[in-house]
Amino acid sequence: ALGNKKTDMNVRTCTESDVASIAVVFTESIHVLGASHYDASQRNAWAPRPADIEALSARLSGLQTLLAIEGDAVIGFISYELSGHIEFLYTAPGSERRGVASVLYREVEKALPGVSLFTEASLVAKPFFLRHGFSVVEEQNVSRGGVMFRRYAMRKAVVAQHGAQADRPALRAVRRLS
């Protein structure tokens, strides 16, 4: 169960045939969920309608992408690099605040044990990443299509390996050196 609503959600790896569904989640998430933080010109520069599926496909190539699936629908996705950079994390309108993003994020932590994670978070995503242990490294003002946006460079220190006290030997080593 996610949040207070029961759901049968599965996580799976993205395939080329999923790009159109991802484009819908990306675009609608920005236009619907981002409306409280970004004006129409910002949302249109960030995610034009109709979605540019070819451009998104190009951005996804070279990234690891996991999908949250409910029934036959993509309700969220996360894309990341093996370096620890989280490029995309979006949930579909109607699926927000149900734990979908947290489930996807935890899959990345499991996939990248011992890797520091970092991202450029929107105003909408910043609280999510703060709740998951990230800190703001820098506030950034960036331009997309001539339109200015505020975002946050954020980082989380090395993710502990799942299991009993995986980082203890490292702590002992640091104490001996100090």
Predicted regions and their residues:
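A short beta-loop-alpha structural element at the N-terminal edge
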Residues: 10-24
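Conserved GNAT-fold acetyl-CoA-binding loop/helix
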Residues: 23, 27-54
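A short helix-loop-beta-strand connector motif used in the catalytic cores of GNAT acetyltransferases and
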Residues: 50-67, 85
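Conserved beta-hairpin
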Residues: 63-76, 81
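A short, internal acetyl-CoA/4′-phosphopantetheine-binding micro-motif in the GNAT/acyltransferase core
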Residues: 86-96
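Conserved acetyl-CoA-binding loop-helix of GNAT-fold acetyltransferases
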Residues: 97-110, 131
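Conserved catalytic-core motifs of GNAT/GCN5-like acyltransferases
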Residues: 116-120, 135-153
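Terminal substrate-recognition subdomain of acyl/acetyltransferases
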Residues: 124, 147-178
